[in-house]
């Protein structure tokens, strides 16, 4: 496993991924495509909430509870899961951001990204 992830490892993706842009809402950094939030950081920037399929999140949390937690009660209705940045390595954190972005963009953008990043976000 590589070095633990921090917000600076993933912040550039908020502006680099096609149609994505970073915003601050009540002091919290979020990444959006249009009006859809696909990544949101806690105020202290230790937790990264990410778009993730509802039907798969319980299994993800159960498989790696030291890394992933269920979202807050108000976010349970969304395709969302929380990740502890310190428990992730840099590559894993970047892959989670790209996977979250994939959930909110057209498939043609996903295919174009794959062609230009054959080894993933690194």
What are these regions (language model features)?
Residues 1-122:
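Charge-dense, helix-prone N-terminal extensions
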């Amino acid at each position: 496993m590589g070095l633990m992830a921090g917000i600076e490892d993933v912040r550039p993706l908020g502006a680099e991924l096609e149609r994505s842009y970073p915003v601050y809402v009540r002091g919290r950094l979020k990444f959006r495509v249009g009006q859809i939030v696909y990544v949101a950081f806690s105020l202290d920037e230790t937790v990264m909430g990410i778009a993730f399929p509802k039907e798969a999140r319980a299994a993800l949390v159960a498989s790696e509870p030291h890394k992933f937690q269920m979202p807050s009660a108000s976010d349970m209705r969304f395709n969302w899961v929380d990740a502890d940045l310190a428990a992730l390595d840099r590559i894993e954190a970047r892959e989670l951001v790209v996977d979250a972005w994939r959930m909110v963009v057209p498939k043609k953008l996903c295919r174009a990204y794959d062609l230009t990043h054959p080894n993933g976000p690194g």
